[in-house]
């Protein structure tokens, strides 16, 4: 008798399934993209026929952080949090089996459609997201990396929180954290300042995510991330670039999220009672945009396959003609990119590089093959420090990646390096900030001298940031080398 596809969801993998090789339990269908620490694949659970997501993590990655992610997912049982089914060790990879969300992340949908979201769509997504945060915070857990790339949608439109690679749990002995972790543009001021933080740090990130969904990118996305880190704690809370495009309810919701004093910031439970969320429409309003995004993805996949087949045929012809193999750069040639267009208001077009920015900062990007190749070349699988000093700031991976991308183009960037070295020499020592913080001497300078100092301020700060980054890497590299040496010794036993 033919077994019908089960209506009940897969709750957990059986003990029998966990003793088998993962290939016996699952059929892996396709690669979905890159998440924190590893690649994510779509697969089918053979016994039940249920589609799942499998994150394959190299064991060289930071196992402590991966185990933390699994531990957090195991403890969660909510419709608004991605479910965990079990895990396997296979050769040098850890396979983490999770709930599959067929529509991908909110940032994927924005990128594929090349459109920002409407207020109604944002409100519906935020309602589910807040319910997920309310659950996590009730369990005394902080997500710490809330952004559009970590909010996944299933095909029905239900939003679920994902990617607990940097999530942490509050305990009685450690009620507040003082480690900088997460993605720079979404980070709360108290997180950047390392003055200790709690669950409402996620609420600030949710406010930034609201602006991201409305405008296509977070505030400060156009400036250097290190400069944003300086600006977020000192500047007033960010707002919409064109507030007149949005209703008072939405503007007030974002304002309540982006309160700089965490003690005065609203909680997830309080925000669920906000009129903007209380009046949110059902998830059915998201089905059209999900269908549109999935259709675009399917068409691009077909076009990519067609181009790859044509290139394979051409390479075979070239080989026959010249008796030499001709290598084709199929990945870069076949990857679709959204055109650069406007980025204003609801249902407006956005620049592709504003959403692609997130992929460099840890957001999963569906079928972004060319970026995957770059990540494999420079080996920047997300790593947080495992020493007692606390995790490494995730945003530092962004700078490492930028450095590695720039290495093959040293000649192209020669002028930039020359400008940097020139700028280092044009600032007299007496232009540095006085150690005692006494700026009275400025009163004696002429207007022209004050103008020159003001113009020189940004280059001076860039220089200080570069010096700081180099000192950081100089201290970090010996620690990583020592860790790698210990791992190699352990593998030899």
UniProtKB/Swiss-Prot annotation:
Question: InterPro entries from the entry?
Answer: Kinase-like_dom_sf, Mst1_2_SARAH_domain, Mst2_SARAH, p53_tetramer_sf, Prot_kinase_dom, Protein_kinase_ATP_BS, SARAH_dom, STE20/SPS1-PAK
Segments of skewed composition (Acidic residues): 308-320, 369-378
The coenzyme or cofactor needed here is: Mg(2+)
Q: Where is the SARAH domain?
A: 439-486
Where are the residues of the annotated region Disordered?
Answer: 303-336, 369-414
Q: Where is the composition biased (Polar residues)?
A: 325-336
Specify whether Manganese is a keyword of the entry.
no
Q: What is its main location?
A: cytoplasm
Per UniProt, the keywords (alphabetical) are: Apoptosis, ATP-binding, Coiled coil, Cytoplasm, Kinase, Magnesium, Metal-binding, Nucleotide-binding, Nucleus, Phosphoprotein, Serine/threonine-protein kinase, Transferase
Record text on activity regulation: Inhibited by the C-terminal non-catalytic region. Activated by caspase-cleavage. Full activation also requires homodimerization and autophosphorylation of Thr-179.
Q: What GO biological process terms does the UniProt entry carry, in alphabetical order?
A: apoptotic process; hippo signaling; intracellular signal transduction; negative regulation of canonical Wnt signaling pathway; positive regulation of apoptotic process; protein tetramerization; regulation of MAPK cascade
Q: In this chain, where does the modification Phosphothreonine occur?
A: 179
Plastid in keyword set: no
E.C. no? 2.7.11.1
Active-site residues from the entry: 145
Compartments where located? Cytoplasm; Nucleus
Q: What does this protein do?
A: Stress-activated, pro-apoptotic kinase which, following caspase-cleavage, enters the nucleus and induces chromatin condensation followed by internucleosomal DNA fragmentation. Key component of the Hippo signaling pathway which plays a pivotal role in organ size control and tumor suppression by restricting proliferation and promoting apoptosis.
What's the protein name? Serine/threonine-protein kinase 3
Q: Which organism is it from?
A: Xenopus laevis
